[in-house]
């Protein structure tokens, strides 16, 4: 999709300094995340790209809380299904009980995302956000993922909720999406158009 007429777009930030920062982007998910505060877990930029300006990954405490919640849920379900606590004597049931929370724990620990002035990366890959050719939102429930593909074949995806948990990260990505839409022929699916590009939710106030 490209624009039929001239449109005044926000300026592109400098690849090294990130200035000027893009204007605040509209959000679909207005709930705050639980970001990691340990700078030692800050992702690195893709090879040959400018510095990381913003990043997000769930905090360790959030991951541990999620593990405990899922473990407790599986414990309750196991007791209900077996009609009591007799299953606790069977090691096979313990393996089944632990499988789901362990897998969720490992998945959550490995997920991250970062943005520079003109790129976005996650644990699934990276793209040049001003050279996008495809913007799609897919997935059901409360955690749909935004899939991005650029002109060089780069591709990545991440949960929209997490991308928008860091407003400044989302500002960078959204600015690249809007520029791509007005300068390139970009394939956009209906879900992305409604929930990302034409979203009508109020903008969230910055919290510095």
Task: Label each residue range with its predicted role.
Residues 6, 137, 178:
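Residue-level marker of positions within ordered structural domains that often coincide
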Residues 73-80, 97-99, 150, 158, ...:
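Hydrophobic, well-ordered secondary-structure segments
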Residues 76-94:
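Membrane interfacial helix motifs at helix-loop boundaries and amphipathic/re-entrant anchors
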Residues 91-138:
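Conserved beta-hairpin
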Residues 1-81, 204-208:
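N-terminal membrane-targeting/pre-transmembrane regions
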Residues 122-165:
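Acidic, Ser/Thr-rich low-complexity segments on the non-lumenal side of membrane proteins
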Residues 65-70, 90-96:
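Hydrophobic H-region at the start of alpha-helical membrane spans
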Residues 151-208:
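A membrane-cytosol interface segment of integral membrane proteins
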